[in-house]
A protein has these predicted regions:
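Boundary/entry segment of secreted carbohydrate-active catalytic domains
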Residues: 121-202
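Glycine-centered tight-turn motifs at strand-turn-strand junctions
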Residues: 26, 49, 58-84, 93-95
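Aromatic-rich peripheral "rim/lid" segments of glycoside hydrolase catalytic domains that contact
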Residues: 129-130, 134, 138, 183, ...
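Surface-exposed, proline-anchored Ser/Thr-rich loop/turn motifs
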Residues: 20-43, 60, 101-120
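Short, acidic/polar
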Residues: 178-198, 315-325, 425-437, 514-521
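Bacterial N-terminal signal peptides
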Residues: 7-14
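Substrate-binding cleft and catalytic face of glycoside hydrolase catalytic domains
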Residues: 194-399, 403-406, 411-414, 420, ...
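Glycoside hydrolase catalytic-domain groove-lining segments
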Residues: 192, 259, 385-386, 404-415, ...
Length: 570
C-alpha cells in the first residue's frame, strides 16, 4: 500500500508541475526562509512589460516593481521590513507566477531591486529554474581528492561496472537455484560472480543491516518476519551474509563495495529505520567497550531515547567494528557507501521517526517526503540533513580508524552516499551533497538511484538523469555513480506494477532493456558518470522483469542484456 501511494503521488505531482508551465517562470526565492533580504529569478520567453508585487498573507501590499524586460533570466533582490509570511507575484505579457516567502528577521525597508539579466531563455530554464542555478560554483570540495575536472568529462578507462551478486543471491542458491549464461552453468555464488567478471564486472557489492544472524522457524525454514509482520528483507542483509559475500570477494580477488545502512533490517526513500544493537547480536562490543555498553544501557536503551551526541558515538564505534570485520576477511574495499536512498533520513533520524531532540520529525507525514524536495529544501536542511551529516561523519571516522589500526593505506578509499532521483529534482540532489559537504561529510563520489520506468517528479526521465549528473558535477565537483539502475524486459507486476513507464523508444523487451543500459553507460562515460550498478541482476521474486535472467523452476537463463554484457559496457 505504501508503494502504491508513492507511485500515485509522484504521478499526480508530475501532472501538476506540467500544468503550471507558461511563458514565465519565477524561481523560489533563495535563501528561504531569509533574514531581511533574499534573491529571486524571473525568466520570460519574450520581451515585454513585467511587474513584481509583494503582499503579506492578508493581502496587504508591501512593495512593487515594474519596467520592460527583454527575453531571458533576470535577477532581483527583495528586502522586507517585518518578520512574516509573504506572497511574491510576477506578471508579464499575460502570464503570471507566484511563490511564498518566509522572512525570519526584518530588514531596513520594503523594496525590490533589479540586478540585471543573467542568462538567456532556454528550454532547460523553462522546465527547471532555481536560484541555485546562478549561485557561484561550490568550493566545498576544493581539496577533495576526487575534484578532477578531466575525470568528469571522460571516465572510460576507470568506469566502474558493478555487476554483482545481489543481496538475494545467497538465499536463492540455498533454495536450489542455478543460473545458465550461454553454455556456462553456475551452481554456486562464486561461479556466478566469476561469470560476471568474465563479462566485464569490475567490483562486487553487499548491503549491510545491523541484524546479526538469519532467523528460522521451528521447521528450519527462514522466518521472514520482523516484529511479527512479513518482511522480504528480514533475512537478506544480515552481518553473517555480508561476511560470506566479502569472503567470496577476497577469494575471487575482486574489490567489493559495502553499503552500510545503519538500519536494523532495511531503509530507503520510503522509510528510515533505526539500528538495533541487541546484546546477543554484538557480545564482543558489550564485553569490551564500556562507552558502547553505557550509552546503550547494556542493550536496553531505545534508539529514540538517545541524544544526537550519543548516537554519533555509537555509530563511530559501529563503523570501526564493521570495517574491522570486513577487512579481516581479506577483501579489498575501495568504496564505502553509507545509507540507501538516504534523501530523507539515515540511521534512525528521518521523516516520521521519533527521536529525543527534534519532535518535528516524528510528526512529519509521508507527504513531506515528496513535497520537501520541490518546495522546502530548507526544512530538510533544518530537520533532517543537519543531523544526518553528523551521523555519516561519525561512521566514516570509525571506518577510517579500522584502516589506521590495521596499518592500511586509505589514499584510494572513497566514501559515498546514494539518494533516490524519483523523489528528487536535479536541484535537490545537488543540494543534498553540497549541504553534506558544508556540514562535515564531503562525499568522494555522489550516488544516485535511477529507475527510468518508475514514476518520478519529472516526465522526461532522460533529462532527469542528465541534469542530475551534470548539476552534481558542476555544483559539487565530484563524479556520480548510479548505485541502482534497471529497466524491465516485460511488464512489472505486484508491488512494482506502477514501474511500467516506457522511456522513449526503449521498449519493454530484452532488446529495449539492453539498449537503454548501453546508452546510459555510453553517455555517462563522457559526462561525469563514474560507474553503474545494475540492481539485483539475478533476483527473481516480483523483480524478475527487471532481472538479467528469465526464470523457470529455479533455473535462471540469461537475457540478451547479460549475454551481450561485455560488448555493452566496453
Amino acid at each position: 500500500m505504501r508503494r502504491f501511494f508513492t507511485i500515485l503521488l509522484l504521478a499526480l505531482m508530475s501532472v501538476c508541475a506540467f500544468a503550471q508551465r507558461n511563458g514565465l517562470v519565477l524561481s523560489q526565492n533563495s535563501p528561504n526562509p531569509f533574514d531581511g533580504t533574499t534573491c529571486v529569478y524571473l525568466a520570460v520567453e519574450q520581451a515585454g512589460e513585467a511587474s513584481l508585487v509583494v503582499a503579506d498573507v492578508y493581502g496587504y501590499f508591501q512593495t512593487q516593481w515594474s519596467q520592460p524586460l527583454e527575453a531571458g533570466v533576470h535577477k532581483f533582490r527583495i528586502t522586507l521590513r517585518a518578520k512574516g509570511n509573504y506572497v511574491l507575484g510576477a506578471h508579464h505579457n499575460g502570464a503570471s507566477g507566484s511563490v511564498v516567502m518566509f522572512c525570519n528577521i526584518g530588514g531596513d525597508a520594503n523594496r525590490i531591486e533589479y540586478l540585471g539579466r543573467v542568462d538567456e531563455w532556454t528550454d532547460e530554464v523553462y522546465q527547471n529554474l532555481t536560484a541555485d542555478d546562478y549561485e557561484e560554483e561550490f568550493v566545498g570540495y576544493a581539496k577533495n581528492k576526487s575534484n578532477d575536472q578531466s575525470a568528469m568529462t571522460n571516465n572510460s578507462s576507470s568506469f566502474r561496472v558493478a555487476l554483482s551478486l545481489s543481496p538475494f543471491t545467497l538465499n536463492q542458491f540455498d533454495a536450489g537455484y542455478t543460473f545458465q549464461i550461454g553454455d556456462r552453468i553456475a551452481t554456486t555464488p562464486e561461479e556466478l560472480q566469476l561469470i560476471y567478471q568474465s563479462l566485464g564486472s569490475t567490483e562486487m557489492y553487499v548491503r549491510l543491516a545491523t541484524k546479526r544472524h538469519k532467523t528460522y522457524k521451528p521447521d528450519g525454514t527462514l522466518d521472514n518476519t520482523t516484529d511479527g509482520k512479513a518482511d522480504e528483507n528480514a533475512n537478506v542483509h544480515t552481518f553473517d551474509q555480508v561476511m560470506t559475500t566479502c569472503r567470496i570477494a577476497a577469494a575471487l580477488d575482486i574489490p567489493i563495495n559495502p553499503e552500510v545502512m545503519c538500519a536494523y533490517i532495511y531503509m530507503d526513500m520510503d522509510g528510515t529505520q533505526a539500528p538495533r544493537f541487541y546484546r546477543d547480536d554484538y557480545p564482543e562490543l558489550y564485553a569490551t567497550n564500556a562507552t558502547w555498553r553505557t550509552i546503550l544501557k547494556d542493550g536496553d536503551a531505545q534508539w529514540s531515547e538517545l541524544s544526537l551526541e550519543d548516537i554519533c558515538t555509537v555509530l563511530e564505534i559501529y563503523g570501526e567494528f564493521v570495517a574491522d570485520s570486513i577487512l579481516a576477511t581479506g577483501c579489498t574495499v575501495n568504496d564505502w557507501n553509507l545509507g540507501n536512498e538516504a534523501n530523507f533520513g539515515f540511521a534512525g533520524i528521518g521523516i516520521g521517526v521519533p527521536n529525543a531532540f527534534d519532535q518535528t520529525l516524528a510528526k512529519a507525514g509521508p507527504m513531506k517526503r515528496y513535497m520537501a524536495s520541490l518546495f522546502s529544501l530548507w526544512w530538510l536542511k533544518k530537520h533532517v540533513w543537519c543531523y544526518n551529516a553528523k551521523q555519516y561523519a561519525a561512521v566514516k571516522r570509525g571506518i577510517l580508524k579500522a584502516y589506521a589500526k590495521a596499518g592500511k593505506d586509505t589514499s584510494n578509499v572513497r566514501f559515498s552516499t546514494h539518494i533516490a532521483t524519483v523523489t528528487s529534482t536535479p536541484r535537490a540532489s545537488a543540494s543534498f551533497f553540497r549541504y553534506m559537504a558544508d556540514n562535515g561529510y564531503a562525499v568522494d563520489v555522489a550516488g544516485i538511484s535511477y529507475y527510468p520506468s518508475a514514476p518520478a517528479m519529472s516526465f522526461n526521465k532522460k533529462k532527469l538523469l542528465t541534469k542530475t549528473v551534470t548539476r552534481i558535477n558542476k555544483k559539487c565537483g565530484v563524479n556520480v555513480f548510479i548505485g541502482e539502475f534497471s529497466y524491465p524486459s516485460q511488464n512489472m507486476v505486484g508491488p512494482f506494477a506502477g514501474w511500467n513507464q516506457q522511456l522513449g523508444n526503449y521498449t519493454k523487451s530484452q532488446q529495449g532493456q539492453a539498449d537503454i543500459y548501453r546508452d546510459v553507460i555510453a553517455w555517462g562515460k563522457d559526462n561525469g558518470l563514474i560507474g553503474i550498478r545494475y540492481w539485483a541482476p539475478d533476483y527473481e521474486g516480483e523483480w524478475y522483469p527487471m532481472s538479467m535472467f528469465e526464470f523457470e523452476n529455479k533455473v535462471g537463463t540469461a537475457k540478451q542484456i547479460l549475454t551481450n554484457h561485455k560488448e555493452i559496457v566496453q
